C-alpha cells in the first residue's frame, strides 16, 4: 500500500513538473511608471498589444491613459481595457471673469450685466471619464483600435459621449476629434477647455491617415458638418447638403517635434424665409501648427488659423455662434 502511494505521488510530481516548466515560458512585461500596464503573454505578441494600447498620437492631454489592468485572449493578440478616470478641479476667481467652470474669453460679461460679485469659487468633477478600449493586431487589419469614452458634461451633468470610433489600416470611422485640428500642438492646461483660438471640435467622420513615408504623415477626411450662426426671422439654419472635406500634411523631425499644414472646405446651407428657398455658400479654413523641443524640459507649441465660416470649429468662438456671412439677396446675416 505504501509502495503504491509513493508511485502515485511520483507520477503526480512528474506530471506537475512539465506544467511548471511551461508556465516559466510566459513573459511578464512590467513598467515602473505610474500609468504602466502589467501584461502576461506567452510570446512577443504582448509587446505589440502594449504598444497599441499606449499609443496617444490621436488623443489630447486631458484624455485618460491606458488602463492598468486588461483582459486578453490566450494568444495575447487582443486586449480589452475598461477604466474610470476621476478628475476634480477647484478654482478661485479674484476678479469675477467668467461665470463658467471653463475659461472662455468670449463669455466674459460686459459691465452692467447685473452680476457685481468680483470673486468666485468653483469646483468641478464632470470631466471624470469612463472609457472602453479594445485593441489588437490581425493579419488583414494590422493594428486596430475600438475606443469609446464619455464624461459627465451633458445637460444637468448627465453622461455625454466624447469619442466612439474604430481605427484600422489608417482609417478612422466614427465620432472623434476633427481632422482640422492638431492635438499634439495643444499645450497641457489645467482648464479642460484648453487654449482659446485653437481649432477644437468633435465630429462623425471617415478619415484616412498615411504614414508610409519617412517623417511624413498625410491625411484626408470627410466629416459631418456643424453649421451654426446668428440668425434672424428671415434666415434659418437647418439641413446641410454636403460634408466637410479636410486635408493635412505633417513633417516630423523627431518624436516630439513637427510642423503641420491643414485645410478644410465646407458648403454651408441655409434657408431664406423671404425667398422660400435653400441656398449654399462655400467657406474654407487654413491652419499652420507646430510643436518642438528647445531643450529636454522646454517644449514650444503654436497654432495659426485663418478662414471664413469656421467659427464653430474654433475654441471659445464656438460658444457664442460667431459665424457670420451675408445671406443671399437679403440684408440678413447668419
Task: Indicate residue ranges for each PLM-predicted region.
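Transmembrane beta-barrel strand/turn architecture of Gram-negative outer membrane proteins
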Residues: 59-76, 135-138, 145-148, 263-265, ...
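Conserved small/polar residues in nucleotide/adenosyl-binding loops
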Residues: 323-330
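Loop-centered beta-sheet repeat module
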Residues: 239-289
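Outer-membrane beta-barrel translocator domains and adjoining extracellular loop/strand segments
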Residues: 96-101, 156-162, 184-191, 229-237, ...
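Outer membrane beta-barrel
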Residues: 73-102, 113-227, 246, 250-253, ...
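Beta-propeller domains
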Residues: 281-285, 294-299, 305-313
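Bacterial Sec-dependent N-terminal signal peptides
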Residues: 1-26
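N-terminal periplasmic/intermembrane-space "pro-region" immediately following the signal or transit peptide
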Residues: 22-94
